[in-house]
């Protein structure tokens, strides 16, 4: 699906909790709409309000509607996390040029690895019979 028109997404958002309008058999393809809504800040806010209402009142809604809202909520939070990750500044540092810390090769790192073998039977208490 290419970018859905905003008015279509709004109409979808208004009716996606109505199984008579969007039947259960269409549930597998709804994730495309969820992703498109997550990209629009205004629609995301409306969707979040609607999903929070449904998820706070689980007993008042069918399991299908709760599942739809859960998946939409996941799409919204994932999009928010992706946006937050875009603000990260990644800096690569070449540790070979640092003078106060010697560069350790892979073998030197492995030399610091301590492996111990323990007998689990020493730590298991026998139950009194």
UniProtKB/Swiss-Prot annotation:
Protein name: Nucleolar protein SWM2
Main location: nucleus
A Gene Ontology term for the protein's cellular component: nucleolus
Keyword Nucleus: yes
Subcellular location: Nucleus, Nucleolus
Family to which this protein belongs: Belongs to the SWM2 family.
The UniProt record lists the keyword RNA-binding: no
Keywords for the protein's UniProt record, in alphabetical order: Nucleus
């Amino acid at each position: 699906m290419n970018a859905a028109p905003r008015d279509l997404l709004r109409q979808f958002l208004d009716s996606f909790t109505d199984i008579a309008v969007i039947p259960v058999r269409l549930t597998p393809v709804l994730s495309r709409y969820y992703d498109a809504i997550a990209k629009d800040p205004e629609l995301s806010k409306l969707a979040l309000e609607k999903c929070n209402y449904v998820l706070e009142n689980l007993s008042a809604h069918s399991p299908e509607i709760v599942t739809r809202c859960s998946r939409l909520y996941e799409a919204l939070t994932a999009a928010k996390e992706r946006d937050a990750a875009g603000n990260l500044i990644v800096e690569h540092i070449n540790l070979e040029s640092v003078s106060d810390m010697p560069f350790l090769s892979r073998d030197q790192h492995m030399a610091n690895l301590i492996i111990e073998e323990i007998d689990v039977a020493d730590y298991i208490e026998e139950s009194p019979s």
